[in-house]
């Protein structure tokens, strides 16, 4: 009981802690006896410097993380726990805490897709920077939606509860280990982790002081419907685009839209400012790899187009011109298609035999939205509680993302601004769109940048990010840098100097 009281006091007093590095106040193994509500600590062990070697998660579909991700880690206390906020919950989590030189801060990391594994590799970075860090499997093993069939509480865990419970538990264990809770807490995630980021800001505004929401799957049901619709349309092989035809379509899109920002640089600064018509590529004679058949033109139009919920009239965005190099033979990425199928099979119709052939584009997005009830979709635009308590949110998205439409990020940012009239949203929440960047990373445009450094400056030094410089690399060498700008600003060439150097661009409204 003494430890539990100490935990509560330390969390309460965390904000008053001086900004200095701290060393553990108790031994790691003693945390095994820590009593917390609905929590069973299954491991509390010291890890020597450079000694951690991951193994495959028993329930995960992914291979074990690359050991190189853990090279050079400092000594840390490794804690594993199982959380049971409901009778059907089985949430696994890990928390890593530096044995010495803790920076007094906590950074949790997000997941991907259906998230059935703890993100050990993602935890390595924060730990190396002096953070206490944690991750969760969101309450199930494996990266499919099968876990939700017949288990409504597990769906709630996946949708939002597991991350919040992990956060509360992590802060309590941190307080017990250092006799001081974290003075600042951060969240960082991309894709499903970006969805988790926005869900935390919406539901639990006090959990985190700063949040990174990368390429967020906030419109979970809409993305699922779009991906399934695309796969259904493309079951007709004559409508599919070969890699060569996708390349030709991509070139046509870039040729048509590249100069909308006044600069021909091989990147589309904002695809929404260009009305690209794939019909311009329709074959005028014999079919070959440089043109599209009439059926393939319709495929492209469908993949670019939004899909509407006929009951609420809301639209979920399609893919954007410039994303074609990431398309598969069935349109959206294989991951998007798999999670889309599982969404309808296990979460909407709750029928393991349901197949893509049964998808109805006129009615099934509405059914998916109704079944979700805000459990997984993170589209609540009321961020006022998070902003009012001083929270800071950086959201980013690649314009060439072939897995989660960047249009959904723009829609959400605009909805927040529309709802919070009288609030200068950009003082606390900024969206950065990355021309030519794919899903979370990669692509023809600059796609390597450090959003957490920008967030730390914003939260801790009150320096709002006016731009974030991103790099493009080829064979490990930087060959282009460009500022990412707070939406709706775009990087605008100053007129002189190399177009491959960020210093020659300014962020301006178009």
Language-model regions, residue ranges each:
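Catalytic-loop region of hydrolases
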Residues: 17-104, 121, 250, 263-268, ...
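Cap/lid segment of the alpha/beta-hydrolase catalytic domain
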Residues: 65, 103, 112-182, 225-226, ...
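Short, solvent-exposed loop/turn and secondary-structure capping segments
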Residues: 90-93, 118-123, 138, 144-149, ...
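Alpha/beta-hydrolase fold nucleophile elbow
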Residues: 180-191
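Glycine-rich nucleophile elbow surrounding the catalytic serine of serine-hydrolase chemistry
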Residues: 189-199
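A catalytic-pocket lid/entrance helix-loop region that shapes and gates access to the active site
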Residues: 199-201, 206-308, 433
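Short beta-strand/loop motif that positions the catalytic acidic residue
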Residues: 394-397
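Histidine-bearing beta->alpha loop at or near hydrolase active sites
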Residues: 428-442, 474-475
């Amino acid at each position: 009981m003494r430890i539990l009281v100490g935990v509560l006091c330390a969390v309460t007093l965390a904000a008053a802690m001086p900004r200095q590095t701290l060393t553990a106040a108790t031994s790691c193994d003693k945390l095994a006896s820590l009593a917390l509500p609905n929590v069973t600590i299954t491991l509390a062990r010291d890890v020597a410097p450079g000694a951690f070697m991951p193994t495959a998660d028993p329930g995960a579909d992914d291979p074990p993380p690359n050991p190189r991700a853990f090279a050079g880690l400092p000594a840390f206390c490794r804690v594993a726990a199982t959380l049971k906020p409901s009778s059907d919950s089985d949430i696994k989590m890990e928390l890593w805490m530096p044995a010495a030189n803790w920076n007094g801060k906590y950074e949790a990391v997000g997941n991907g897709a259906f998230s059935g594994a703890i993100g050990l590799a993602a935890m390595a970075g924060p730990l190396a920077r002096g953070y206490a860090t944690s991750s969760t499997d969101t309450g199930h093993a494996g990266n499919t939606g099968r876990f939700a069939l017949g288990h409504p509480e597990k769906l709630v865990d996946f949708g939002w509860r597991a991350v919040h419970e992990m956060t509360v538990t992590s802060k309590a264990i941190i307080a017990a280990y250092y006799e001081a809770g974290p003075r600042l807490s951060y969240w960082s995630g991309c894709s499903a982790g970006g969805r988790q980021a926005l869900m935390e800001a919406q539901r639990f505004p006090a959990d985190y002081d700063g949040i990174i929401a990368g390429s967020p799957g906030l419109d979970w049901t809409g993305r699922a419907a779009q991906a399934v619709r695309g796969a259904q349309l493309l079951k007709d092989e004559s409508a599919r685009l070969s890699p060569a035809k996708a390349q030709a379509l991509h070139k046509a899109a870039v040729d048509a839209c590249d100069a909308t920002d006044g600069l021909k640089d091989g990147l589309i600064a904002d695809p929404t400012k260009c009305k690209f018509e794939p019909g311009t590529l329709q074959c005028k004679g014999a079919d070959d790899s440089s043109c599209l058949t009439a059926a393939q033109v319709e495929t492209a139009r469908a993949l670019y187009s939004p899909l509407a919920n006929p009951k609420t009239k809301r639209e979920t965005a399609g893919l954007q011109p410039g994303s074609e190099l990431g398309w598969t033979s069935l349109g959206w990425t294989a991951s998007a298609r798999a999670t889309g199928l599982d969404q309808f099979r296990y979460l909407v119709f709750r029928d393991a035999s349901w197949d893509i052939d049964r998808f109805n584009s006129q009615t099934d997005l509405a059914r998916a939205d109704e079944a979700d009830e805000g459990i997984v979709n993170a589209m609540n635009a009321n961020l006022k509680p998070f902003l009012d308590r001083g929270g800071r949110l950086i959201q980013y998205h690649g314009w060439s993302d072939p897995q989660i439409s960047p249009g959904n990020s723009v829609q959400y940012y605009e909805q927040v601004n529309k709802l919070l009239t009288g609030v200068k949203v950009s003082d606390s929440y900024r969206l950065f769109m990355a021309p030519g960047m794919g899903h979370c990373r990669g692509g023809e445009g600059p796609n390597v940048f450090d959003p957490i450094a920008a967030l730390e400056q914003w939260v801790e030094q009150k320096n709002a990010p006016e731009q974030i410089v991103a790099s493009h690399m080829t064979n490990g060498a930087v060959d282009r840098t460009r500022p990412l700008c707070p939406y709706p600003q775009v990087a605008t060439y100053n007129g002189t100097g190399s177009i491959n150097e960020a210093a020659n661009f300014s962020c301006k409204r178009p």
